[in-house]
């Protein structure tokens, strides 16, 4: 491509097969990497941050070769980056687009903020009910403590 073509070069290389996670808020990019355990992955991974975005101002993007995420993994994303979009790529073509949506329940993802909650004192899996998706309000199934997504700690 010549510079005189008046076209912009791709900032991130094309992906043959895998998943593109797009529209990640820039300040949440590395949280998403950690949530999905990508730091331990053997796949080729491209991570870009602070790309211009009309919706977010600045955004992050992650391209993971030959990896397709489970619904459980996608649910984890909804806690920190609820408006992320996933593009499923096969043979360089987008074959499916998924909007990350917060599920009705979050199991084993969030730590309860109540120090007296049984999940903080016994070896058991946490369970939260999402009572307000728009504002990210979660309620512990066991002690019924409510917490907002801004104050949560991930497991």
Swiss-Prot record:
- Enumerate the UniProt keywords alphabetically: Metal-binding, Pyrimidine biosynthesis, Zinc
**Where Zn(2+) is bound, by residue?**
112, 117, 140, 143
In its keyword annotation, does this UniProt entry include Zinc? yes
Q: Supply one GO CC term from the record.
A: aspartate carbamoyltransferase complex
SUPFAM superfamilies in UniProt: Aspartate carbamoyltransferase, Regulatory-chain, C-terminal domain, Aspartate carbamoyltransferase, Regulatory-chain, N-terminal domain
Q: Which cofactor does it need?
A: Zn(2+)
Would I find RNA-binding among this entry's keywords? Answer: no
- GO BP terms: 'de novo' pyrimidine nucleobase biosynthetic process; pyrimidine nucleotide biosynthetic process
Q: Which InterPro entries match?
A: Asp_carbamoyltransf_reg_N, Asp_carbamoylTrfase_reg, Asp_carbamoyltrfase_reg_C, Asp_carbatrfase_reg_C_sf, Asp_carbatrfase_reg_N_sf
Manner of cofactor binding, per the entry note = Binds 1 zinc ion per subunit.
From which domain of life does this come?
Answer: Bacteria
> In the record, what terms sit under GO molecular function?
metal ion binding
Q: Tell me the subunit arrangement.
A: Contains catalytic and regulatory chains.
The free-text function statement in the UniProt record for this protein reads: Involved in allosteric regulation of aspartate carbamoyltransferase.
Family per similarity comment: Belongs to the PyrI family.
What PANTHER family would the database entry show? Answer: ASPARTATE CARBAMOYLTRANSFERASE REGULATORY CHAIN
Task: Return the protein name.
Answer: Aspartate carbamoyltransferase regulatory chain
Gene name on record?
pyrI
